[in-house]
Amino acid sequence: MAAVSGTFNMMHPNPRKRRDGLRRLGLLAGACGQLGTSVITLCTGTRDPEDMWRSHPENDVPEAWQDLLASMERALEIAEEYEVTLAFEPEVNNVVASAEKGRRLLDDMQSSRLKVVMDAANLFREGELPHAEEVLDEAFELLDEDVVMAHAKDVKNTGEVVAAGRGELDYDRYLENLRGFGFEGPLILHNLEEGEVEGSVAFLRTKLGVNATYSEQRGR
């Protein structure tokens, strides 16, 4: 098993909700050994009280960042206790909405237990895909050494998230960047229905065939 999801809203405006999420994270971390993994994936959350995947104007206020640091500090204490790694995703609707903020979080926390899940589709808001090369290159320049896992889904220029191969994400550039720093971790299909699996697998196999160097690295 590559990882388990410990996702909860680390930025929920209700402190009790944040504490409950941390409590559940502790239970999950304690079970990781039996589950056969040492990686727990997280999102950094949003001030939206109803939907942790919806942006909120208060995500960018200084108090929100301080709340995130407090939640992450406690989460990393749990990670240290159970000897697991926490891997967060930069995501446009969360407080860590960009690779730049992801780098800031890593630098603020200074923990070997904190790493990154790279999900290229999460880095683009509506209308931003024409700048994909610039955005992807910057993301890997800032985060490459801390990436332990990659997600494979897709996004349209409207901002709609879809299964891999059904959107407009520059997968050649995405895989080229993964290849460029010698990534050998898992690349996991994400955000798709059962009926979409076959098509997305075929799409990725084609792309990985084109990116032969990456395929060879994964085969070692």
Question: Each PLM stretch: what is its role?
Answer:
Residues 7, 54, 61, 88-91, ...:
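Residues at structural and domain junctions
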Residues 1-3, 12-13:
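N-terminal glycine-rich cofactor-binding segment that shapes the pocket for flavin-like pterin cofactors
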Residues 11-118, 214:
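Active-site acidic/histidine proton-transfer and metal-coordination neighborhood
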Residues 15, 36-38, 73, 98-220:
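Histidine-acidic metal/acid-base catalytic patches
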Residues 7-10, 46-50, 94, 124, ...:
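Feature marks short, surface-exposed loop/turn motifs that line or immediately flank catalytic pockets
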Residues 3-6, 42, 83-90, 118-120, ...:
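Short beta-strands and strand-loop turn motifs
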Residues 3-5, 50-51, 74-78, 149-150, ...:
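Short, flexible segments with low predicted structural confidence
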